[in-house]
């Protein structure tokens, strides 16, 4: 008798788990196209997840980097962009542990007409991005860091080669 009850409860739990999995798959498929940032083409070309945002008519290529704490805009392009300087300076630590003080700006960017507002550290990335330009012909303008992903609840899906919002 108890064995039968445990068996029935187990079947019910498995059915509920299966229903939740199916529901999650359906929800994932309903993410609006504007909320899906594809990086398939750039991954094929450069082996890096790069997404093109816009500010007005200007296209801006950003490397998606969840390992970077903050978003960064290349210092060499900042004067061409609309931005609001923050009232503070912050520190940035390079891969080798070197510490530098950098300006911080607030910028509006769009992806397929969806607006995003974020804080960007202003840092000279010419040397790093110059290698990408000469090797792959891709001109990078900045890095989208984990602060952006957390703020806008974006996840990266390497199976689908997209970043998508779970909001």
Show where each model-derived region lies:
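Pepsin/retropepsin-fold aspartyl endopeptidases
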Residues: 1-167
């Amino acid at each position: 008798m108890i064995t039968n009850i445990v068996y029935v409860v187990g079947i019910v739990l498995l059915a509920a788990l299966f229903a939740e999995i199916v529901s999650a798959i359906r929800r994932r498929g309903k993410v609006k196209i504007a909320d899906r940032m594809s990086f398939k083409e750039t991954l094929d070309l450069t082996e890096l997840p790069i997404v093109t945002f816009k500010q007005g008519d200007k296209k801006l290529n950003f490397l998606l980097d969840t390992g970077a704490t903050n978003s960064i805009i290349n210092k060499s392009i900042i004067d061409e962009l609309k931005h609001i300087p923050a009232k503070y300076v912050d520190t940035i630590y390079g891969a080798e542990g070197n510490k530098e003080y950098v300006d911080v700006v607030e910028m509006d960017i769009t992806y397929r007409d969806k607006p995003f507002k974020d804080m960007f550290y202003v840092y000279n990335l010419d040397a790093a991005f110059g290698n990408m330009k000469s090797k792959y012909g891709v001109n990078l303008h900045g890095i989208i860091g984990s602060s952006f992903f957390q703020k806008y609840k974006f996840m990266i899906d390497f199976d689908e080669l997209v970043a998508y919002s779970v909001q």
